Amino acid sequence: MAQRIFTLILLLCSTSAFAGLFDAPGRSQFVPADRAFVFDFQQNQHDLTLSWQVKEGYYLYRKQISITPTKADIAAVQLPAGVWHEDEFYGKSEIYRKRLNVPVTVNQAAAGATLTVTYQGCADAGFCYPPETKTVPLSEVAAAIDATPTPAVTQTGETSKPAAQLPFSALWALLIGIGIAFTPCVLPMYPLISGIVLGGRQRLSTGRALLLAFIYVQGMALTYTALGLVVAAAGLQFQAALQHPYVLIGLAIVFTLLALSMFGLFTLQLPSSLQTRLTLMSNRQQGGSPGGVFVMGAIAGLICSPCTTAPLSAILLYIAQSGNMWLGGGTLYLYALGMGLPLMLVTVFGNRLLPKSGPWMAHVKTAFGFVILALPVFLLERIIGEAWGLRLWSLLGVAFFGWAFITSLQARRAWMRIVQIILLAAALISVRPLQDWAFGSPSAQAPAHLNFTAISTVDELNQALAQAKGKPVMLDFYADWCVACKEFEKYTFSDPRVQQALGDTVLLQANVTANNAQDVALLKHLQVLGLPTILFFDAQGQEQPQARVTGFMDAATFSAHLHDRQP
């Protein structure tokens, strides 16, 4: 008897274990959106809290969260800082993991008032959900006398990394500040400024001279930090507008004009009357005293020379896009500190540490013009796409390395020949994308892609299945916001093995980027949780559930899957 019971248990375990061998490789291991991102809300009079419990291995996109009131007035919602996630197609995006709490201040809500909350997320395994929309009913709330927005709480979980939002870290601001110090408008002024800071006294202890120079630099840094905070705060209010294509194009034009001013095409500075007033205010301060030196530094931060106006404006405009006040203030502080380091050295050690003035200072100014030109390319790349973005980077690289090579020809030193060879090689490498675009290249030819027939509704799908004429059908769901869909397109569908395996298959594709009513109806009808999802139908128009693919597959795996699904 005991042996029979043992045998029965063994058979049951074996059945459970071997059942997994017959599972389809494409069967979804992903949970529905409501389980991946558990949404909840709680209202206490004017205070409303929206919360998401994010399942392990999933994340929400910060920029995809929108909150729209109906019959209600709410304070400006400030989403907490997230963590940074990077992929090949969309670059860096701010995301939330584990748990997200968003406080909302309800200034006034009439009877029947609601909030429409839209959000979207993905799985780390390469599976994205369509945007989810929830309607939050609001309790009736009378208008408060003094309704102020509640500051957003921080996300629990991973540590945010706001500095990663910029293509250059805040440390670059320090290096840019040091570089600006060696432009022709700034470097010759350091000995004069040093004398003013010391109050005309030549015999001061090293410690006293260093202290006065440091105080002057801190005064200058205070002005720049305040500018950074103000601009970042203003950018925070208009952050969504700053991502609009027209605004990005406008910013790109402004950055280009700033770069042209660094090339000497025109001069950009404060009006002379305002500069004169600031200079007179600075001259009234007493040099050699900590208080007077600090005020002189603060005023000096407002007097922008032609060499510093363009880089400062570029940094301020870029900070406005981040909307991060800590990053804005810190970046401008490091920028001012970089400009002040040479001044501190001159004040303590004298002019002997400064390099001699010469044409090289104009070259430094021009080089910063090329640095500023990188910002328009970075902004336009979001609009024009990866291919054209690469061509713009190529054009900028050719221009910079070509200019540097021509400039280096004036040098007489032998070791500069090595530098010239490196610059020439860099220019030749940079020109390759432009060469492939203009003349074509066998190695650079875009791979052939599958020729899909577009469908958008259930009726169109049924009609396409009826017209398949006894052939198997593959239906691919695609959306612009689906990273893995783009990976399928670039790496899998372009593979010759995949194209050969699909030679006798009718190819359909549903683009659900808009996520409108007919898209939602199609997804619901076919029980599609998210993207990428690929469905297969047999010659009779019946879906083969075991062949369904959810999540990304590389070319080899997908090709094997296509062969395995064949009857």
UniProtKB/Swiss-Prot annotation:
Lineage top rank: taxon: Bacteria
Principal subcellular localisation of the protein: membrane
Transmembrane segments: 166-186, 211-231, 246-266, 299-319, 326-346, 360-380, 387-407, 418-438
Membrane disposition: Multi-pass membrane protein
Record bears the keyword Signal: yes
Disulfide bonds: 122-128, 185-307, 482-485
Signal peptide limits: 1-19
EC number: 1.8.1.8
GO CC annotations on file: plasma membrane
Catalytic activity: [protein]-dithiol + NAD(+) = [protein]-disulfide + NADH + H(+); [protein]-dithiol + NADP(+) = [protein]-disulfide + NADPH + H(+)
Gene Ontology molecular functions: electron transfer activity; protein-disulfide reductase [NAD(P)H] activity
Cellular localization per UniProt: Cell inner membrane
Domain named Thioredoxin: residues: 435-567
UniProt keyword list: Cell inner membrane, Cell membrane, Cytochrome c-type biogenesis, Disulfide bond, Electron transport, Membrane, NAD, Oxidoreductase, Redox-active center, Signal, Transmembrane, Transmembrane helix, Transport
Family membership noted in the UniProt record: Belongs to the thioredoxin family. DsbD subfamily.
Function of the molecule: Required to facilitate the formation of correct disulfide bonds in some periplasmic proteins and for the assembly of the periplasmic c-type cytochromes. Acts by transferring electrons from cytoplasmic thioredoxin to the periplasm. This transfer involves a cascade of disulfide bond formation and reduction steps.
NCBIfam families: PRK00293.1
Entry protein name: Thiol:disulfide interchange protein DsbD
Organism, scientific name: Salmonella paratyphi A (strain ATCC 9150 / SARB42)
